[in-house]
């Protein structure tokens, strides 16, 4: 699934641009970075990404995305950061123990808050919300997990900004500083 596609760029391509910069920066700082997708392959978003993450010894999981309203000329803008909200309408398929474990939920919220605040500080982007949802990738992952929506692809001005390499560097700086803040608080 290539995700959203607006103004001649696919979400998957933006995701990979930011991910590669983020991985490089984190590895330079001594972090070990694992990925569910390092090339143009399709990985099932419902359970397979979480299953892959759950088999690793990783501490946290960050899912990188770009947003879209579905409108051709959206005025929506900003960064959204999601952590898991346990909703009984969406029971866990592969993570019955950890999906609503209080420690994991608390750590996910703390990770989301740290990254969100520093993304906003680094980029100057509009705060589109620090939110909780029962997205599968957050529900099925057995460790602290966040999903980042780093800007709106269907807003022409924001689309131009999020595809700019220097702006992507600011996104990466915010994510890295957020991760560092999270670990400093442990």
Enumerate the predicted regions with their spans.
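Short glycine-rich His-centered loop
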Residues: 1-8
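Active-site-proximal helix/loop segments of hydrolytic enzymes
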Residues: 9-186
